[in-house]
Amino acid sequence: MKFIDEAKIEVIAGDGGNGVASFCREKFRPFGGPDGGDGGKGGSIWAVADRNINTLVDFRYSKMHKARDGENGRGADCYGKGADDIKLRMPVGTLIIDNNDGELIADLTEHGQEVLIAKGGEGGWGNIHFKSSTNRAPRQKSEGKEGERRELRLELKVLADIGLLGMPNAGKSTFISAVSNARPKIADYPFTTLHPNLGVVRVSHEKSFVIADIPGLIEGASDGAGLGIQFLRHLQRTRLLLHIVDLAPFDNVDPVKEAKAIVKELKKYDESLFDKPRWLVLNKLDMVPEEERKKRVKDFIKRFGWKGPVFEISALTHEGCSELVTEIYDYIAVQRQAEQRSEETPQMVEAARGIDSIDPDDPRFKIID
């Protein structure tokens, strides 16, 4: 399936049905009074996050989504039928943005999350609502309200724990295929990866994390060179970035120069992404003679000016990969625990202790300023 991570759509909720002015006409009740029913509610449009969908391709070719109008009211106190709502299923990680003013309407981060994106119009009132002690035969009625109409921009940011950075042919796709169930296209030419790939890395039956591989960056990507930086937003939700470097490039380019170019483009794109935790992964050690490895690694780290974690691997032979995966999971586990602790509010803590609130006059408690 073609990977599409951007789309523009128009959503039109249904109009409410009109109320009706009607009077009861039955045998022996020639002046039975008003009995006009209300109009039905127009259909609304909802966005629903679905983990079984991983692309916005359906919305690239289906741009207009319109809900049905509510039915008009009828006599004999018959109300119009409300229209059914429409649910648009989107990938988890989709941002829904108003295309006119740039307002962020919703961020779909959880499977099954539902967000109202266009509200259906309310039905109009029938004349039965306008009856009063001074107006026994009202002829007033009201029309149904118009449904909301919006132009939306959908942007997909994949949800992953780990993001891979690197030049084309650095071995990112080989690495993700070595440690996960992902099977991206792998070849010996640049820009083999044309769209993000996700893989689930399983450390054990109950321990896993998600890793994202995006197309390689080159110098000048922020100015549109290569595939540009259009896919970098997929790394914004990650907890950790792995900067993969080809330590044995076939064209004899300087790995340090290429690594610095990646960092430069990252900073140009987004300071927050640049400040995200980053580990250095030196790949293709199987291509470096055994006696030169230590010297080449040391020289690279010194010239690159790197002071963070460093891992030496060969994605092709899987050398060093299991150790790296273990370190990644340990790091992710700590991050997840920290996030869970930060989500605990004082109210949650009190509820866990069986205390809903503290009465200042309760002698069991002493308030310390």
From Swiss-Prot:
Start and end residues of each stretch annotated as Disordered: 128-148
Domain Obg residues, every copy: 1-159
Keyword match Magnesium: yes
Coiled coil stretches, renumbered: none
Subcellular location(s) per record: Cytoplasm
N-terminal signal peptide: none
Annotated positions binding Mg(2+): 173, 193
Single biological process term from Gene Ontology: ribosome biogenesis
InterPro entries in alphabetical order: G_OBG, GTP-bd, GTP-bd_Obg/CgtA, GTP1-OBG_CS, GTP1_OBG_dom, GTP1_OBG_dom_sf, OBG_GTPase, P-loop_NTPase
One GO cellular component, as annotated: cytoplasm
Keywords from the UniProt entry: Cytoplasm, GTP-binding, Hydrolase, Magnesium, Metal-binding, Nucleotide-binding
EC numbers, comma separated: 3.6.5.-
GO molecular function ontology, one term from the record: GTPase activity
Residue intervals of the OBG-type G domain: 160-333
Needed cofactors: Mg(2+)
Statement: the UniProt record of this protein carries the keyword ATP-binding: no
HAMAP family linked: GTPase_Obg
PANTHER family in UniProt: DEVELOPMENTALLY REGULATED GTP-BINDING PROTEIN-RELATED, MITOCHONDRIAL RIBOSOME-ASSOCIATED GTPASE 2
Family: Belongs to the TRAFAC class OBG-HflX-like GTPase superfamily. OBG GTPase family.
Physiological role: An essential GTPase which binds GTP, GDP and possibly (p)ppGpp with moderate affinity, with high nucleotide exchange rates and a fairly low GTP hydrolysis rate. Plays a role in control of the cell cycle, stress response, ribosome biogenesis and in those bacteria that undergo differentiation, in morphogenesis control.
Quaternary structure (record): Monomer.
Protein name: GTPase Obg
